[in-house]
Regions:
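Non-catalytic tandem-repeat scaffold regions and their flanking low-complexity/translocation tails
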Residues: 1-184
Length: 184
């Protein structure tokens, strides 16, 4: 209406200075013009608008870096980087798993992206809900290994609960005393 571009965020709203509406496109938290890239109302320093692309709710990248809603991920192998889910948890917040050829990443929307140590990159996959993942040897919940989980019998129950032949879990915590057989 007034020839300006505004953003509307959870905690604040504002004007994106120097951006023309005809030159601006956005997707959820991410935006770009021919001269700059944005996360909400924040200009992403050093981001390249010509190569910038949104990968999912939680991740975006350009020719030099991968970005999350918490900032850049250092030392990413850009050519091999891939997101493993839609990047949005069930409450609508940006969250999800990604990997390159060397390591696996988990972004929960609050702070730095976690590198999942010990994950088998080649077989690692998200189970689609942005909370749970697995590789050939382990189960992961919220970016952490379920160290006691028995891989062959583990199953996801829903609403952040899972179980194996011996235990019941809520995200990455064992629920002591829970009866595995009657817990559904």
């Amino acid at each position: 209406k007034d020839g300006a571009v505004y953003f509307s965020g959870l905690y604040e709203n504002g004007l994106l200075k120097g951006v023309a509406p005809k030159d601006f496109c956005c997707w959820r938290y991410w935006g770009k013009s021919s001269t700059a890239c944005f996360l909400g109302g924040i200009r992403l320093r050093g981001a390249d608008p010509a190569s910038f692309r949104v990968l999912n709710y939680a991740y975006a990248m350009d020719k030099t870096a991968v970005y999350t809603t918490s900032g850049r991920i250092p030392d990413v192998e850009l050519a091999a980087f891939q997101v493993l889910d839609n990047g949005q948890n069930d409450s609508g917040a940006p969250q999800g798993y990604a990997k390159d050829s060397r390591q696996v990443y988990f972004h929960n929307g609050d702070g730095k992206v976690k590198i999942i140590k010990g994950a088998e990159v080649s077989s690692f996959r998200s189970l689609g809900d942005t909370y749970f993942a697995r590789d050939e040897k382990r189960i992961y919940a919220y970016g952490k290994q379920l160290s006691k989980a028995e891989l062959t019998s583990w199953e996801l129950l829903g609403h952040w609960y899972s179980r194996d032949a011996k235990r019941v879990y809520y995200l990455n915590r064992e629920i002591k005393g829970a009866d595995r057989d009657s817990f559904t």
